[in-house]
Regions:
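Boundary/junction segments of secreted and surface-exposed precursor proteins
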Residues: 4-110, 114, 316-323
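Proline- and Ser/Thr-rich low-complexity, intrinsically disordered segments
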Residues: 319-369
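Exoplasmic/lumenal beta-rich domain surfaces
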Residues: 172-173, 181-277, 290
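Short amphipathic, basic-aromatic surface patches that mediate peripheral association
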Residues: 64, 81-166, 176-185, 294
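Beta-sandwich strand segments
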Residues: 14-21, 69, 73, 90-97, ...
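A short tyrosine-centered beta-strand micro-motif
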Residues: 175, 278-289, 369
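Sequence contexts marking disulfide-bonded cysteines in secreted/extracellular proteins
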Residues: 12-14, 30-34, 40-42, 67-73, ...
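Short beta-strand elements
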Residues: 127, 132, 161-163, 297-320
């Protein structure tokens, strides 16, 4: 009997040691393209956000009342959520703080700067002491016959998080609490009740899709309660491509093919703010990964998911709730002018002092509304 390690088995489909964009090697010999029979193709990632992890990880989601005390102090009016982002694609999601030439790139206002810093050890500050943002470099690998090659492109920004001690990709996931609307299939178009931060992640290989901890998170469909579970290496054309060891390095981070990153609800920023006056009842938690489409993937249409969730610790159902009112302009009217007033909180029904039952009303007279 001959024992072959996984790393040996993947030896002819690897990105390890690939530092030259157009080099000659045999590192892609056994890599498979998405289309059968092709020998020249991008090996792109396909990152999703897992509805099963959003629904069950760490026994969440966890809802807190508007006034929280004791063990939940500091979570007033929060709905804590977990984000898991599996990569079910043919190649790794690889983002880098250092490009192929050893340069790091920064944005200072409207200006772009670069420094040669191959190990990412130098400190850079904008000349005007303004906000410093480092540009993310995405490396996209390509199979050209037996050769593994790559291109690089800018893909958004990242920020150093002192509380975590490493860089996070900016705007990696967003979470919102929404009301489902009949005849609108896309949850991203549903009315927003509450939002959270645009959360940045340090991207790493946290769980394998084949592990007990990651089982069920990786599926071939992003829709709630749908999709075949991908928990076998044979279900991925290039399982492990990327190295299965990405971490929070300032030089290179990512998610290998067949792996996922997980940010638990216990971490900083992993919550949705529930507005005061929100009624108990049925809602949806909507999550989206890479909402700005900064990263190049094989499928850009499966980057969101939505799960049902029932609020139980807010205002009693059908109690009327409360609503902040916002206007589309300065609420001072001259003769012939109009202003649009909108209820800030999304709801199923509305009742204005004018008798109107729409979320927004247009008024042309001063008064209390």
């Amino acid at each position: 009997m001959v024992t072959v390690s996984l790393s040996d088995a993947l030896g002819q489909c690897t990105v390890s040691g690939i530092t030259t964009p157009n080099g000659t090697n045999t590192s892609a010999t056994s890599c498979l393209c998405e289309t059968a029979g092709q020998t020249d193709c991008d090996l792109r990632p396909d990152v999703m956000i897992a509805w099963s992890a959003l629904q069950t990880y760490a026994s969440g989601p966890s809802e807190y009342p508007q006034v929280c005390s004791g063990g939940c102090s500091g979570n007033d009016g929060r709905l804590r959520v977990t984000g898991a982002t599996p990569n079910i694609g043919n190649g790794p999601l690889n983002f880098r703080g250092v490009d192929k030439d050893g340069k790091r790139w920064f944005i200072c206002g409207t200006d772009t700067f670069s420094i040669v810093d191959p190990n990412s050890t130098q400190t850079f500050s904008c000349p005007n002491s303004g906000l410093t943002k480092q540009l993310v470099v995405q490396r996209v690998y390509r199979k050209v016959g037996n050769n593994m090659r790559f291109t690089e492109r800018f893909a958004g920004t990242m920020t150093y998080h002192p509380s975590h001690g490493h860089n996070h990709v900016d705007d990696w996931v967003t979470f919102s609490l929404r009301l489902a609307i009949a005849n609108e299939p896309n949850p991203l178009n549903w009315p927003i009740v509450g939002t959270g931060a645009k959360v940045g992640f340090c991207l790493m290989d946290y769980f394998s899709c084949t592990s007990a901890s990651g089982n069920g998170h990786c599926r071939n469909d992003h829709i709630y309660n749908q999709g075949t579970v991908l928990n076998q290496q044979s279900q991925f054309q290039n399982f492990g491509l990327g190295g299965q060891a990405y971490n929070c390095s300032p030089v290179s981070q990512g998610i290998s093919a067949g792996w996922e990153d997980v940010y638990s609800e216990s971490l900083d920023g992993m919550w949705i703010n529930i507005p005061p006056g929100t009624c108990n009842g049925s809602y949806y938690i909507v999550a989206q990964v890479d909402p700005l489409n900064n990263f190049l993937e094989s499928n850009e249409n499966n980057n969101w998911t939505a799960i049902p969730f029932t609020l139980t610790q807010q205002a009693p159902a059908n109690s009327g709730g409360t609503c902040g009112i916002i206007s589309d302009r300065e609420p001072v009217l001259c003769s012939g002018e109009q202003v649009v007033l909108t209820c800030q909180n999304a709801g199923y029904t509305y009742l204005w002092s004018t008798g109107a039952t729409t979320r927004s009303i247009t008024v042309d007279q001063g008064g209390n509304y």
